[in-house]
Amino acid sequence: MRTSLLPVSWIPAFLFLTMAFPAAADGGERSPDPVIAAAPGDSVAADSADVEPELDLDLGGALRFNVLFEEFDRTNRQKTGEFTFDTFRVNADGTYGDLFFSAEYRFYAGYRFLHSGYAGYEVQDDLDVRVGVHQVPFGVQPYFSNSWFFNLAYYAGFEDDYDAGLKVRYTPGNWTLIGAYYMNAEQTGFAGGTTFARYSFDVVPATTDDLGYAGLEADRFNQEINQFNGKVAYTLEAGGTSTTFSVSGQTGQLYNRSTTGTERHWATSVDLDGQYGRFNLRLGLIRYEMRPPGTTGPGRDAVVMAAYNAPYRVASKGRFYSGGLAYNLPVDLGPISRFRFYNDVSYHDKAPDAWVDGASNITGILTSAGPLFIYTDFLVTRNHPFSLPASDFGSALAEGSEEWNVAFNMNLGLYF
């Protein structure tokens, strides 16, 4: 992967991050298979400076389908569910001495985008630097959620988020420290992508033609720039168990392309990730606020965000409460080697009291069989944007509705 030199304007940010945040573990992408991306510690650099390093390249990908049943969708009920294409992706990961790199591109029905792409340098065993489009250090990583559908915080850009910038990570002993600076969200014009077609949710420009049906009364021209992130985590180990406590924070600007004005956005997260034998427990609290420039009055109560080629409105201030409990059961049933039973809960507390809060409970099983991974999820949700009637999609994370919805989904993924 070719990477351009850093602009001069990044140098102060880099020096600040290096001194203030000697940095933490990078996340990954949502694949239940053993992580494909080469870790910096897997460097193939030779012991002798006289020996040329070798290029170690891994190529891979995945093909996934969904089997979906939605009780709230009349057509889906009449057809007794649908078997649909989810995604096809290609990955390239590797190392060259102390250098490492990773790239992933995804294809969906009708759109495509760059999921991630970065290059990095391993300064020492517990310190590395990476630049490009990579996971934002915020909350439990690589994922808080166990289910294929994620928790509600993901849909507001606070879980498994990817942006374009520079990250430093430092992992001394049981500590994990991260500092990062992102010039902007990932650019989506690469290889035919569109503004709305991206993997993770970001504040984006949109028009009333896009979201007039969902209450957008005027065109929006906002986007994310100049975001700083910091994360500190500590893992406490005792008697074969481990508990990781982490605190994350981010702050940046929202830029209005029409007025050229900017305003601030920020978020904080406090999390616990515990591994107790075969059980895993995760708890998290997120507080956030986004102040959209160029808007006044009630229009400031929501921002426009998008991913997967679909925009919607999100409450500009609120909290997310999340929890997850999982149990890993190794088995020997033909090709099946493991079941992971889980229950994920999340709650979206929106700042305008008149708006209906969001809630989600997802109970499921992840079945592992060699390269085949199957998520089986049963969802009971309110104002989950991807589990409700299409007419409510654009306002689910804003005004919302009182309706509860039930769905059942199986995601079948072949990873290679």
Q: Which residues does each predicted region cover?
A:
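N-terminal periplasmic/intermembrane-space "pro-region" immediately following the signal or transit peptide
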Residues: 21-64, 416
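Outer membrane beta-barrel
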Residues: 51-72, 79-188, 193, 234-237, ...
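Outer-membrane beta-barrel "beta-signal"
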Residues: 323, 402-416
